[in-house]
Amino acid sequence: MTPNVIRLICRGSVALIAAVLAVVPLHAVAQSPILQMLSKNRPVELVAKGGQFLEGPLFDRDGNLWLVEVLGGWLSRVEGDKVVRVAQASPDSQPQGAALHKDGRIFITDRRLGVWTYEPKTKKIDLLIRYYHGQPFKGPNDLTFDDDGNLYFTDAWQTGVDDSSGALFMADAASGYRKLTKLIGNLAMPNGVGIPPDGNSIYVSELRKNRNWRCPFDKSNGGLFSCFVSTHFLSGNGPDGMKIDEKGFVYQANFNSQGVYVIDPNHEIIEFIRIPRGRFTTNLAFKPGTKWLYITEAQQNNVWRVEVDNIGMTPWGLK
């Protein structure tokens, strides 16, 4: 049974401090006493520098840190303290996010090319997902896998506050990722996506409305139950990429805020991790089996890392 596209229902928790900050200009919020109060002043270390608009970090089984360069069009790898270019699907490529498949391939969402894959051992590139019902995507952004290997990705570009036609898609693993289902269809630039440890729901960040949605899975038909707004954010242009730790805490990069929000399993913001410089925090990755959270920043093109309280979830590709 093919599920209907979910209509989003706006409910859920909205923190009091979000209401207070609603009247504060966004450029002032990142310096606000409230965000300073949320900071634990964790030491943040510089790992590497280079590239053009860094995004989509991931670790492979050998411990290599990969990422994408949105403006450069490259899938790249951190070597020492440098960002080294490895593969490009096309001169027109604009990769946005990346995730590791269990077979070793790296899946890349691309604003112009859909979803393509790279096999590090053979260096093979495959343009895997180009169209939905014969039509090109608006511009895929971020992605994640569930524990069955199904791929979820957001389709974000050309959408915004005045055109809430962004979407969340699922590509079925059993079909070789050829069977696509649109799960959500009315989002204002959907961005990050993640599945918590219990596997019963999926989070989707909606950048242009500065909030996250949580959508419970309806496992009877492979779709979703009605979604609800789980978190509103306090600064920046909106939520970008996310990662989740083994206890269900969400780490949310927020674009133009110079930092990362930490959200507890009850959807409350409990901490703001500020990076030393660069405002364009784009995405995150946990070093496998550790509490080290790696952060890409795209204004000054730095990779940072910070030690948090819990070990990160093990991605499906590393299980």
Stretch-by-stretch model annotation:
Residues 78-82, 119-123, 172-176, 218-220, ...:
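Short loop/turn segments that connect beta-strands within beta-propeller blades
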Residues 71, 159-166, 207-209, 255-256:
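Short, solvent-exposed loop/turn segments at conserved positions within beta-propeller repeat blades
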Residues 43-48, 83-88, 126-133, 178-184, ...:
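A short beta-strand motif characteristic of beta-propeller blades
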Residues 285-319:
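Blade-level signature of beta-propeller repeat domains, shared across WD40, Kelch, NHL, RCC1
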Residues 74-76, 114-116, 167-169, 211-213, ...:
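A short loop-to-beta-strand structural motif that recurs across blades of beta-propeller domains
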Residues 48-64, 90-114, 133-151, 158-159, ...:
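Beta-rich, blade/repeat-based domains predominating
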Residues 12-25:
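Bacterial N-terminal signal peptides
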Residues 30-42:
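Blade/loop signatures of beta-propeller domains
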